[in-house]
A protein has these predicted regions:
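Charged/polar positions within long, soluble alpha-helices
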Residues: 29, 39, 212-215
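Functional transmembrane-helix hotspots
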Residues: 33-48
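Membrane helical hairpin/interfacial module
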Residues: 1-37
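Long, contiguous internal "core" modules enriched in hydrophobic/ aromatic residues
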Residues: 47, 51-236
Length: 236
């Protein structure tokens, strides 16, 4: 999105991690149902049980949020792989050449195609960013929309967004280091990439700490008995 020259080295790892983690997150609404093997009971289809899903449930929001996020993220990952798939189609032989050529959607690496690709890619990234923010906000509302003391708070949405970016950067650093060691990509994944990710991780750490401090100081200053009981229980 910002056309950073460092994006090409870390972008693919970040995009792949996004898709994998979203697919993993998609399992949790099914797990939270309780009897996961009967998940189809909540689907809106006519049956003799006369049971219908509660569309006001926050878990319903998760279904739509996670589904849209995984679809757009997978398309974003696939779009970034088009030049790589076209390159593979030229390097392999036999049925693999036709397979990769079909996956690359006929990307021929011409100047006009590259110009179109470099124009469309940042636009797609600009679409993914607000979608990611909205998805993590929806997940936070699973907790914030309840009347549970300590959870019913307006700060949960930005708190979850900051935590998602914070943990995502940390996971990306670990994954990139493993890829660098296993596949001997020291010349490609250089110390400057890890240094910049470390700076970004520090910034998000401070932001996450700020949200945590704000949450605790607000509860402490309010002094409501039910909130203070939960507050002190976290320190004992």
């Amino acid at each position: 999105f910002t056309r950073s020259p460092l994006r090409s080295a870390i972008g693919r790892s970040a995009e792949a991690m996004t898709v994998i983690t979203i697919l993993t997150a998609g399992l949790y609404p099914i797990i939270h149902i309780g009897r996961s093997w009967l998940f189809f009971f909540v689907l809106p289809y006519p049956s003799q049980r006369q049971l219908w899903p509660n569309f006001r449930s926050p878990l319903t929001w998760d279904v739509f949020a996670i589904s849209s996020y995984v679809l757009v993220s997978a398309l974003f990952l696939f779009m970034g792989m088009l030049p790589d798939l076209a390159l593979l189609a030229r390097q392999v032989k036999g049925w693999r050449r036709g397979f990769y050529r079909a996956l690359s959607l006929g990307f021929g690496s011409t100047s006009s195609e590259w110009k179109l690709f470099e124009t469309a890619y940042p636009i797609f990234a600009a679409i993914v960013i607000p979608l990611a923010i909205s998805v993590h906000s929806v997940v936070s509302w699973d907790f914030a929309m309840t009347l549970m003391p300590g959870w019913h708070s307006a700060i949960f949405a930005p708190y979850f967004v900051a935590g998602a970016i914070f943990s995502g950067i940390a996971g990306l650093i670990v994954a990139m280091n493993l890829i660098r060691k296993v596949y001997h990509l020291e010349d490609y994944l250089r110390p400057v990439h890890f240094n910049n990710l470390g700076i970004l991780l520090l910034v998000m750490t401070l932001l996450w700490f700020y949200f945590t401090f704000t949450e605790y100081i607000t509860v402490y200053y309010g002094g409501e008995p039910i909130h203070m009981t939960i507050f002190w229980s976290k320190f004992t």
